[in-house]
Amino acid sequence: GTGMVATNAVKQRTGNVSAGTSSFSMIVLEKELSKPYEMIDMVTTPDGSLVAMVHCNNCTSDLNAWVNLFKEYQELLGIPVDMDEIYSKLYNIALTGDTDCGGLLSYNYISGEPVTGLADGRPLFVRSANDKFNLANFMRTHLYASVGVLKIGNDILFNEEKIKVDRITGHGGLFRTKGVGQRILAAAINSPISVMETAGEGGAWGIALLGSYLVNNEKKQSLADFLDESVFVGDAGIEVSPTPEDVAGFNAYIENYKAGLPIEEAAVKFK
């Protein structure tokens, strides 16, 4: 529950997404789901509310590997390397790409993904001769892939179970480059995403806040009230809403992604 605490997402109708080496979403529910789902785990907030959790084994590792390749190229040219600048340039150029990534596909499976039924994984980049292959689309497809499996799981919650949320907050390394990961995630789950200044801190920040709650809660407040009134004090972070174009593009991408999963299965079998 440290991610929930770090993002002030312990109340019903709130949620958080942690996106780093792996990723997960936690949506605090008002009521139980209509039925069990293999890809959705049921947990609780630290103070007992029901939470629907989608966990993905892979998120930014493959994306980071590609960024490191560009770092090596920059070093080859004898240009001083600033990793924050490289990430910023590559992530922001992705936002200029086609919303469906021009047909390009990426499977970021360093390991298997239970949500898509794969016990093992192979990182793959796939394109056809007629796809729009350029740097913007290349980076965009890898950003999409970082939250693609998360989208598949959350589509069940929002489209089939009709879950309603007032606020979803993102944290973790994907959000260090301002505005980009946030916009990609907003398109993926068709929901406004808030990111706080502490977005890159994740679970460690949540652990510290839980410790503070145990030690400094002189008013004997509930955890939610303590976070609202003593920690965040109205700070909901900076919110980015999805655009219809981004949502439609990501939906088209994820249909291609799901159709291409046999390619990933074949790679696992033969490589």
Model-derived segments and their meaning:
Residues 1-169, 174-271:
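Active-site core segments that coordinate phosphate-bearing ligands/cofactors
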